[in-house]
Structures are given as structure tokens and as C-alpha cells.
């Protein structure tokens, strides 16, 4: 051991020497053949811990700080600690803390401000005593200020006690001195790697390099850009990105070591202790310029001086106050910048000089500083080992984290037979959010040091692998312990406000734990976890949303699937029956799960769909709840102003309506919602008409009205007649049920007449003779023609017709691209829509975007124009201002494609589409429609072609003499299944009025076949109003085939049979 600095009280442990100051490093004979584990320096005393766990002290003992009454000039053993294996010590001005290998803390010395934590009334304690209030807590680090103390536990809890004159306890401005350890609750949840204390200021350092400081700040020693004391922990933002791995404090200054080996200093600089070649104070962290060419691996602070070790040269550098020789430079001069400590330093990787005895060279193991003294533990070159590196943490001094080594250790014990300390270790780890937040860090490229509002610093794949390795059927005791810790200790302690982004990580990782997906744990773990998540304050929730938004899709889907499973589980319980006494808690649970999904859905939408929207669909909803009833309840809640946008706790008394969370509905469920909404509106319109009619009996000025919207049309003038009626129709009348009458036909419209009306009028309106729409040969689709002589009234009519079709649950045949439905739902068409409408043009645009070279102008020869046909002639349109003069290049090609798409789908047809849009929404607007995705709305308007002919046969009903196994029915289905697809579709058109099936699928298409009189010479007859087929009792298969084909080939017109 080498010692230098103030020896006036014997604090260097050199024995009875004459000098009061030692100007350069001097060997201590006492430590020959002894290995030092730790050194603590007080203002006038020093404590040494040897490798065997024994403690020695020397120096001033006026306040009992040595823990014994022996000699003060040379180190003497503290016999009271003889039975303890001490691993670390820390010293205040005149008090000492010692930590043993069991995590227990012993204290002695001055206790004027409660800095010993013993809750006693004595001014001084001369013999070490155990701090009993910490005896049940496993402490891994201790630190001392002059009159206060800090401790870090294995569970990442920070405790403080002693003086709080300057706020150095971090407990708030109202807090007086504390005589027993107090938990700093404001830091809960953060994963810490170090605690440090200066004269009257304190620091904690997180695993990802964030620093929180509090206490005295007269000289800027907290690095917060001012000189105001802090009474609660404050984040030192300027160092967050610097990968800080170690921090130490002097009386009024601070030094921080980076992962790359740089040193930042700040605070009091009056003696040059900051190393910036000045005596100025620094209120912001500043890098020590003269050390920037070297990699520093150790840094230590004395009262007003700083030491740094550079392993490449083996040298120790010091700067600051030198009046007591503490710089080791051979003089008492102060140094304002790093200066080499005198000595024959030997680099661990170097070669020992041959001409000098190796005993004259020192190979530094570790440096220590404190008060006005400095020490260096060294070895001779022949015994030289690697020096300590403060950038690498000692696992024994760190908090619990879930890692490969720890899991292997736990799994190494046979199931059901691991010792109590292992159970305590598992419990401690999974009871602490701080420990979980320090687990699964992204260590590749030191990524976790970039933790912030946009990056979590977590390796999610590591989290998944380690959780699955830990939770195994072969080790049920581990799973049970983890589940119990999460349920009883971790989750109940979660709060809505969090001190830092690092305290949020477990919200990201815990869903990867298989225990969360176990339905047995839904109500005890998953739902309480969701409640804590939903109740987070706006700022931390926003950060969590940011982190979710950059997850890999499968990881994001995992969280979505988890809470979908929770919802289904709860709804199944609800269907079985919930006792009235449990309804309130059930409501709360269901609201929680749905609110979590709502947050995740919001994130998904903001990111442009991290996962497909249909991944949020809960297909079981239709089976588990009455959607119609749910919708009616939701409408009533809206009418009475019930707000479900706030937290879960207030929602327990409000019945859950799934309609509040419409993103879980699949297309079929949404269709049911829309139909329910339409039925409600129709009923309201009918009721209003009835009320008006009743009033008209007593008040002649009030006209009677029809409760239905009646369209009387002629087949030969179907468009003109419909326009005439609809033009005069009031908006409110569109909400009435639609009844269609064809002039000269006897059919009563029970649905079939209406079906054919829509079929015929759309065929007429879309006919090229009107020139309203352009047909695209490549895609066989139509789009609005930008050159039409028709006024906007016709487009308005088509919009109304489409709206009426949806409103009256009728499929219509529209050959529009998906872009139409996007625009109806206020979504922007994209290049994909151009590819659908104009495949060749779309491919060309994609080739332009994908072209890898820079010579786009020469290769494509494009400018911001589009060439359109105008009655046989071509016309060039500019896509942007001065488009003809703007060449398409690598930088603006995306803008060109966007402008092209915008022209085709928006600008060129704006007035026409606006008329269509207005007509459509006049009938079919509202909140429910906006729940649909564009492809779902398309399927609802035109139906789909997901044919399942066996399902059709299965759902068919029979009347009269027929049943499923009747000979005629058997040959009917044989014939039907042998028909080609086109004939089958014709049969659907013949029987139902449309060759497409409803969005709800074949199961919703109920056909009825009934027997009729007459002979086999009669044709089958359809009643499209009722999807009813009159089928004569054919006995021959071939006869049935011929008659059926003959019937379906002539299917237009209605008459009563």
C-alpha cells in the first residue's frame, strides 16, 4: 500500500513518523503481504478492509470513529467486527459504516445528526453496532457524506439517514434529520448501480448511466446549471447520453467516469480540483481536457482534490488542493490540471526495465482518496495482475437482475428442494420493479445507454428467451414463487407517476412472461398489471406508447393477444353468469382489459399499423354477447353523457359496452352494428311518422306522412323516375324503410323487389352511354370520368342509391376500386390503389420509386405533368405549379408519385366525388360507418365471393312435402353442385337478387325450398323477396337440370304466384 497526504492524526497508518504531511507516495510496512479489499477515508481517519474481511482503522479517534481505543498512528484491528466478513466501508467526517457479506450494515463514530442510523441518544458510538432497521434488507453498497449516510439494497432501493440541512437526504424540504434509514420513495422502480455522497450532496447512478443528484449545490456540485440546493432527486440531463459508469464526490465537487474512459468534473474548482486549468466553479459537467487522450479506468475524490488512474501508462494523475501533500507530486502546490503522482509506475501490459530491481516499480491495483489523504494498493511487477476497472461493475455490489447466470443457478436445484436463500432471491427479484427494469438490457453496442423517451434500452428477445427458460413445467416451485411475488408484492406497489423512463421498462418486458398468458393468472396478475398501465400518468404512458411503436410486430402482437385472451376469458365468465356481488369487480376487470387494447390500438394507428388492424378483432364477441343489445346500451350511455375516457377505477359501476371499443369488432360484427343502427333509425322515423299522422287527425294543418320511403318507378325510365322522387325527398325520409313499386307489376316489396331495383338502376347509371364513369380495361374497374356532360345531380343520386342499399341491407353491383371506399371513410388513396385501377401505370410508378441509380431524369424523362385523353385528343395537365418545367429526379420522385395519385383520385374528380359523397352520407353517414375498414365497407356494399356451397346446402330450410333427404331434394343438390361456378352464381342472382353473398357469409343466407303442385313440365319459380324457391317434384335428374337452367336464364320481372 502506498500512502501520501495529511498524516497529522496518523490517518496514513504509517506509524510514529515525524512528518505531518507526506508529499509523495510512501510504502506502508503494515500492508506487506496483505491484500486490501477496500479503503474508506474520513476527514481525519482512515478505515482499511483486508481480503479476509477484517477491518483496521487509524487516525483521529476523538469521536469514536476508529471503533477501538488502541494506537491511532498505525492501523489497528476493530475487534468488535472480528466475527464479521466485511466487504466494504465508507467514512463521513467522523463516522464510519461497514458492510458485511450478508448485506448487514454496522456503524460507529459521531452520531450528532443521526448519521449512524441507530436511533440512539448518544453523541458518539465508539464500538460498531448493527443498524437493526436494515437487518431484513440486503444492502450491497454504502456511502457517507460528512453528516449523512446512503445505502443501496439488492432490490434497488435507496435508503438515507442523518443530516438534511441542505436536502442531502432527498426526502423533501420539510424533512428534518433522520436517525434511522428512510426509503427514498421517489426513486422506486429505477435500476441503480451505484450510490455516492459528497460533503452534503448525494448521487445515485442507474444501470444505463443516468445520474440523479440532490443536496447542497452552492458551487454547482450537482451539475444542474445553477447553484440552488435540491431537496429531492433531480436528473442530471446533460450527462444522460455520456455512458456514465462511475461517480465519486469530494466535499463540494463531483467527478464522473464514462464507459469510454473519459472524466467529467463539476462543482467547486477554487483549488483546481476540477482539472480544467482554472480555479473557476463549474455548474455544468465539463470534460477534463488534459485527460482526453488517455483512457481513465479509476477516479477518486478527496476533500478538495481528485485522482485518476490511466492503465496504459500505469500512472496516477492528481489535481486540486496540494497543501497537505495529498497530490503526491513532491510539493504542497495546488494543481489546476492533471499532474503525475511521483513514483516508478509500471504498466500492467508493459515490460519491467532490466537494469532496475523490480521492487522499485509499482503496479497499481486500485486508488483511494478521501479527506486530505490518498492511497494506492499496488503489487510488484512480477506479481502484477490487471488493475481494477471502475467501468466494470462488481456483481456482488449490484442489484438483482434476471440474467442467464442467475436463472441457471435457480434451475440447478431440484424442483421443490431449493434453499430459503434462493426463494428469497427469486422473491426479491420479482418483487422489485427496479430489478426487473434493470433486467434484459440491450448490451450490444452499449445500446441501453441510449435509453430515453424513444428507446427503451431493452432487448425484448432476451426477455422472451430468459422468461421462457425460467418458467418451466419441470420447476413449478419457481413459477409459483414468481407468480406470488408479482401478485402480492410487485404489482400492488405500482404507482401512476414514475421517476424516470428507466422505471417503465418492465411494462414492456413483463407481458413476455408465460405466467401472464396463463388464464389462471388473468385476474391476479394480468388484469392488475393492466390496471397499473391504464392508470399511468400522461407523460409515462406517452413514453411507453413510443416504445411500443418501435417494437418488432410479433412482440407488439404478443401484448395485443394477451389482453384479447383476457377479454374473451372474462366474456365467457359473463356468459356463464356473474353473481350480482361480483358484477362491480367484473366491470372493472373488463374495462381494464379493453382500455389496454384501446391504448395499443391507438399506438398501432399512429404508427401506420405496426400490425394489421384485424389483429385486434375478437371474433368470439358475436358468440359471447348480444351485439344489438350492447349497441342500444351504448347509445343510451352516449345520450346520458357517460364518459369512459378516464381511468378504470371510476368505471366499475358503469356497465361495460363493447361498442365503446369498436376496434375489437370484425366485419361481421360491424355489419350487425350498422344494421342495428339502421333499424333504430328506421323505427325512430316510423314512430315520428305515426306521431305526425295521429296529430293530423286533430290538427288538419299537419299533413299525414307515409312511414316508409316509397319509390314508384317504371322499368323503362327507372333513372328518371328515381331521380324525380329522390330529388324531392327530405333528408329525414331517407331514414325510413325503403319500399319499391314497379309500375304495372303486382309484387309486394318484402325485399326482393327492392333488390332488383338496386340491380337495375345501378346497371343503368353505370352504363357507358351516360359517360359518367370511365372503364379501365386492364382492371375491369370504373372510376369517375373527369370529362362528363352530366351534372352533379346524377352523381349525387348514385351516392344516395349506394347509401340506401347499405341502409336497407341490400347488396349492389359496383365495380369501383377500393379507393372509393377509402375516400368515403376519409382515408387517403395510395399507390396501391393506382395499381388496382391502372395496373400498368401503377407498376411503372413503383419502378420509378425502386430505381437504384441516380440518372432518373435521363432514364425516365418525366416532369410533373399527366397526359389525359379528351374526346379523342390528348391534353397535358400540370400536377403542380410549373409542373411542365419541373423534372422528376431522385429527390422528388416520391412527390411526383403522390401528386399523380392525388390527381387521379382527388383533384380531377373533386366536384363529382363530392356530390357522390354528399348523397351517400345523406343516407348512410354516422359514427358506425366510420368503424369500417375500406375493404370491409366494400364487402358490405357489393357483398363478397367467399362462396361455400356446402354451407348453403347445410343452412337451407324445407317446406311442404320436402325435407333434406327427399328424393327430389337429393337430386336437386346433386345437380346444383355439378353446375359450373357461373351457373351457381346465376342461381344466386335468380333466387336472391344478387350473385354475391352478404359480408356475414353463407351462413347468413337462408334459402327456403318448398314443394309445388303441377307436373314436371313446370319451371322452378323464385320469390326473391323471401329467398324462396318453388321446386316441382321432379323425379329425373336430367329434367331437373334442364328446368333449373331454363329458369335461371330468365329471371327478370316480378309477379305473384
Curated annotation (Swiss-Prot):
EC number: 2.3.2.26
SMART domains recorded: HECTc
Highest taxon of the lineage: Eukaryota
Tissue specificity: Ubiquitously expressed, highest expression is found in testis during spermiogenesis. It is specifically found in spermatogonia, spermatocytes, and spermatids with little or no expression detectable in the spermatozoa, or interstitial cells.
Short name of one Pfam family: WD40_RLD
Cysteine pairs bridged by disulfides in the record: none
Compartments it resides in: Cytoplasm, Cytosol
Keyword Cytoplasm: yes
Active site: 1025 (glycyl thioester intermediate)
GO cellular component: cytosol; fibrillar center
GO biological-process terms attached to the record: cell differentiation; negative regulation of smoothened signaling pathway; protein ubiquitination; spermatogenesis
Phenotypic consequence of gene deletion: Disruption causes defects in spermatozoon maturation and impaired fertility in males; females display normal fertility. Males produce litter sizes some 50% smaller, as well 50% of mature spermatozoa have reduced mobility.
GO molecular function: ubiquitin protein ligase activity; ubiquitin-protein transferase activity
Pathway entry: Protein modification; protein ubiquitination
Cited PROSITE patterns: HECT (PS50237), RCC1_2 (PS00626), RCC1_3 (PS50012)
InterPro entries associated with the record: HECT_dom (IPR000569), Hect_E3_ubiquitin_ligase (IPR035983), RCC1/BLIP-II (IPR009091), Reg_chr_condens (IPR000408), Ub-ligase/GTPase-reg (IPR051709)
Keywords assigned: Cytoplasm, Differentiation, Repeat, Spermatogenesis, Transferase, Ubl conjugation pathway
Catalytic activity, reaction form: S-ubiquitinyl-[E2 ubiquitin-conjugating enzyme]-L-cysteine + [acceptor protein]-L-lysine = [E2 ubiquitin-conjugating enzyme]-L-cysteine + N(6)-ubiquitinyl-[acceptor protein]-L-lysine
RCC1 repeat segments: 1-51, 52-101, 102-154, 156-207, 208-259, 261-311, 313-366
Misc remark: T.wilfordii induces abnormal expression of spermiogenesis genes including Herc4, the spermatogenic cells in the convoluted seminiferous tubules decrease and the lumen is obstructed by large deciduous spermatogenic cells. T.wilfordii has apparent antifertility effects.
Biological role stated in the UniProt entry: Probable E3 ubiquitin-protein ligase involved in either protein trafficking or in the distribution of cellular structures. Required for spermatozoon maturation and fertility, and for the removal of the cytoplasmic droplet of the spermatozoon. E3 ubiquitin-protein ligases accept ubiquitin from an E2 ubiquitin-conjugating enzyme in the form of a thioester and then directly transfer it to targeted substrates.
Descriptive protein name: Probable E3 ubiquitin-protein ligase HERC4
Organism expressing this protein natively: Mus musculus
Amino acid at each position: 500500500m502506498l500512502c501520501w497526504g495529511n498524516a497529522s492524526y496518523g490517518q496514513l497508518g504509517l506509524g510514529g513518523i515525524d512528518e505531518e504531511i507526506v508529499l509523495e507516495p510512501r510504502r506502508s510496512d503494515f500492508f506487506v503481504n496483505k491484500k486490501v479489499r477496500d479503503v474508506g477515508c474520513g476527514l481525519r481517519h482512515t478505515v482499511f478492509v483486508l481480503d479476509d474481511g477484517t477491518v483496521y482503522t487509524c487516525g483521529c479517534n476523538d469521536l469514536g470513529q476508529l471503533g477501538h481505543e488502541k494506537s491511532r498512528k498505525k492501523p489497528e484491528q476493530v475487534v468488535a467486527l472480528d466475527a464479521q466478513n466485511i466487504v466494504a466501508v465508507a467514512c463521513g467526517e467522523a463516522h464510519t459504516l461497514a458492510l458485511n457479506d450478508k448485506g448487514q450494515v454496522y456503524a460507529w463514530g459521531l452520531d450528532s445528526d443521526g448519521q449512524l442510523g441507530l436511533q440512539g441518544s448518544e453523541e458518539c458510538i465508539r464500538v460498531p453496532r448493527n443498524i437493526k432497521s436494515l437487518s431484513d434488507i440486503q444492502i450491497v453498497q454504502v456511502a457517507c457524506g460528512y453528516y449523512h449516510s446512503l445505502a443501496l439494497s439488492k432490490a434497488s432501493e435507496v435508503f438515507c439517514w442523518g443530516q438534511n440541512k441542505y436536502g442531502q437526504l432527498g426526502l423533501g424540504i420539510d424533512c428534518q434529520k433522520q436517525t434511522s434509514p428512510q426509503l427514498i420513495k421517489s426513486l422506486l422502480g429505477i435500476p441503480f448501480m451505484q450510490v455516492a455522497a459528497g460533503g452534503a450532496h448525494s448521487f445515485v447512478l442507474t444501470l444505463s448511466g443516468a445520474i440523479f443528484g440532490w443536496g447542497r449545490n452552492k458551487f454547482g456540485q450537482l451539475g444542474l446549471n445553477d447553484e440552488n440546493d435540491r431537496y429531492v432527486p433531480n436528473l442530471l440531463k446533460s450527462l444522460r447520453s455520456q455512458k456514465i459508469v462511475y461517480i465519486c464526490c469530494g466535499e463540494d465537487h463531483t467527478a464522473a467516469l464514462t464507459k469510454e474512459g473519459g472524466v467529467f468534473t463539476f462543482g467547486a474548482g477554487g483549488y483546481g480540483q476540477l482539472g480544467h486549468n482554472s480555479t473557476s466553479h463549474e455548474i455544468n459537467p465539463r470534460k477534463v481536457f488534459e485527460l482526453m487522450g488517455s483512457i481513465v479506468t479509476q477516479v477518486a475524490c478527496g476533500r478538495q482534490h481528485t485522482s485518476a488512474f490511466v492503465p496504459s501508462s500505469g500512472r496516477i494523475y492528481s489535481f486540486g488542493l496540494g497543501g497537505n501533500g495529498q497530490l503526491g507530486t513532491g510539493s504542497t502546490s495546488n494543481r489546476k490540471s492533471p499532474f503525475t503522482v511521483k513514483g516508478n509506475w509500471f504498466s500492467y501490459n508493459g515490460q519491467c526495465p532490466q537494469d532496475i530491481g523490480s521492487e522499485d516499480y509499482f503496479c497499481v491495483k486500485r486508488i483511494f482518496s478521501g479527506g486530505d489523504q490518498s492511497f494506492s494498493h499496488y503489487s510488484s511487477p512480477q506479481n502484477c495482475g490487471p488493475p481494477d476497472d471502475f467501468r466494470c461493475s462488481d456483481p456482488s455490489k449490484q442489484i438483482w437482475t434476471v440474467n442467464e447466470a442467475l436463472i441457471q443457478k435457480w434451475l440447478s436445484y431440484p424442483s421443490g428442494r431449493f434453499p430459503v436463500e434462493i426463494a428469497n432471491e427469486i422473491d426479491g427479484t420479482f418483487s422489485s420493479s427496479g430489478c426487473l427494469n434493470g433486467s434484459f438490457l440491450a448490451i450490444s453496442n452499449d445500446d441501453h445507454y441510449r435509453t430515453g423517451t424513444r428507446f427503451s434500452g431493452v432487448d425484448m428477445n432476451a426477455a422472451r428467451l430468459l422468461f421462457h427458460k425460467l418458467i418451466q413445467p419441470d420447476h413449478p416451485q419457481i413459477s409459483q414463487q414468481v407468480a406470488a411475488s408479482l401478485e402480492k408484492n410487485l404489482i400492488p406497489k405500482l404507482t401512476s407517476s414514475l421517476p424516470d423512463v428507466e422505471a417503465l421498462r418492465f411494462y414492456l418486458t413483463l407481458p413476455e412472461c408465460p405466467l401472464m398468458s396463463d388464464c389462471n393468472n388473468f385476474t391476479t396478475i394480468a388484469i392488475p398489471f393492466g390496471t397499473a398501465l391504464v392508470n399511468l400518468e400522461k407523460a409515462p404512458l406517452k413514453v411507453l406508447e413510443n416504445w411500443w411503436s418501435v417494437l418488432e410486430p410479433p412482440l407488439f402482437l404478443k401484448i395485443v393477444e394477451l389482453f384479447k385472451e383476457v377479454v374473451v376469458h372474462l366474456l365467457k365468465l359473463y356468459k356463464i353468469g356473474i353473481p350480482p356481488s361480483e358484477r362491480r369487480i367484473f366491470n372493472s376487470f373488463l374495462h381494464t382489459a379493453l382500455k389496454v387494447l384501446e391504448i395499443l390500438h391507438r399506438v398501432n394507428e399512429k404508427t401506420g399499423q405496426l400490425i394489421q388492424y384485424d389483429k385486434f378483432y375478437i371474433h368470439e364477441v358475436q358468440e359471447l354477447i348480444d351485439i344489438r343489445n350492447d349497441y342500444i346500451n351504448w347509445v343510451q350511455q352516449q345520450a346520458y353523457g357517460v364518459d369512459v375516457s378516464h381511468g378504470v377505477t371510476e368505471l366499475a359501476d358503469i356497465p361495460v359496452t363493447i361498442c365503446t371499443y369498436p376496434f375489437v369488432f370484425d366485419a361481421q360484427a360491424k355489419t350487425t352494428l350498422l344494421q342495428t343502427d339502421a333499424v333504430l333509425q328506421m323505427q325512430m322515423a316510423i314512430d315520428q311518422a305515426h306521431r305526425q299522422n295521429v296529430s293530423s287527425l286533430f290538427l288538419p294543418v299537419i299533413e299525414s306522412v307515409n312511414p316508409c320511403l316509397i319509390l314508384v318507378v317504371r322499368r323503362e325510365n327507372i333513372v328518371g323516375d328515381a331521380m324525380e322522387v329522390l330529388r324531392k325527398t327530405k333528408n329525414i325520409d331517407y331514414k325510413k324503410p325503403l319500399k319499391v313499386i314497379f309500375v304495372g307489376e303486382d309484387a309486394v316489396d318484402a325485399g326482393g323487389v327492392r333488390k332488383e331495383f338496386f340491380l337495375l338502376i345501378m346497371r343503368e347509371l353505370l352504363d357507358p352511354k351516360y359517360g359518367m364513369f370511365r372503364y379501365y380495361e386492364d382492371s375491369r374497374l370504373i372510376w369517375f370520368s373527369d370529362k362528363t356532360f352530366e351534372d352533379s345531380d346524377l352523381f349525387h343520386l348514385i351516392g344516395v342509391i349506394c347509401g340506401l342499399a347499405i341502409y336497407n341491407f341490400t347488396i349492389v353491383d359496383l365495380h369501383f376500386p377500393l379507393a372509393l371506399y377509402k375516400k368515403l371513410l376519409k382515408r387517403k388513396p395510395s399507390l396501391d390503389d393506382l395499381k388496382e385501377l391502372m395496373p400498368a401505370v401503377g407498376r411503372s410508378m413503383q419502378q420509378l420509386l425502386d430505381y437504384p441509380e441516380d440518372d432518373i431524369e435521363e432514364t425516365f424523362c418525366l416532369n410533373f405533368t399527366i397526359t389525359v385523353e379528351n374526346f379523342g385528343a390528348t391534353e397535358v395537365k400540370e400536377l403542380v405549379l410549373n409542373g411542365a418545367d419541373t423534372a422528376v429526379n431522385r429527390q422528388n420522385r416520391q412527390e411526383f408519385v403522390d401528386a399523380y395519385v392525388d390527381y387521379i383520385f382527388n383533384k380531377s374528380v373533386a366536384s363529382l366525388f363530392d356530390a357522390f359523397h354528399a348523397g351517400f352520407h345523406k343516407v348512410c353517414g354516422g359514427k358506425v360507418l366510420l368503424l369500417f375498414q375500406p375493404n370491409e365497407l366494400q364487402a358490405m356494399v357489393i357483398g363478397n365471393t367467399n362462396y361455400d356451397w356446402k354451407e348453403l346446402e347445410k343452412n337451407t330450410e324445407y317446406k311442404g312435402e320436402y325435407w333434406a333427404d327427399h328424393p327430389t331434394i337429393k337430386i336437386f343438390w346433386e345437380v346444383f353442385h355439378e353446375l359450373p361456378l357461373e351457373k351457381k352464381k346465376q342461381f344466386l342472382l335468380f333466387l336472391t337478387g344478387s350473385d354475391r353473398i352478404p359480408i356475414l357469409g353463407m351462413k347468413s343466407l337462408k334459402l327456403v325450398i318448398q314443394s309445388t303442385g303441377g307436373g314436371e313440365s313446370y319451371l322452378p319459380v323464385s320469390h326473391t323477396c323471401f329467398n324462396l324457391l318453388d321446386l316441382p317434384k321432379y323425379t329425373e335428374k336430367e329434367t331437373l337440370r334442364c328446368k333449373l337452367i331454363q329458369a335461371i336464364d330468365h329471371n327478370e320481372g316480378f309477379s305473384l304466384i
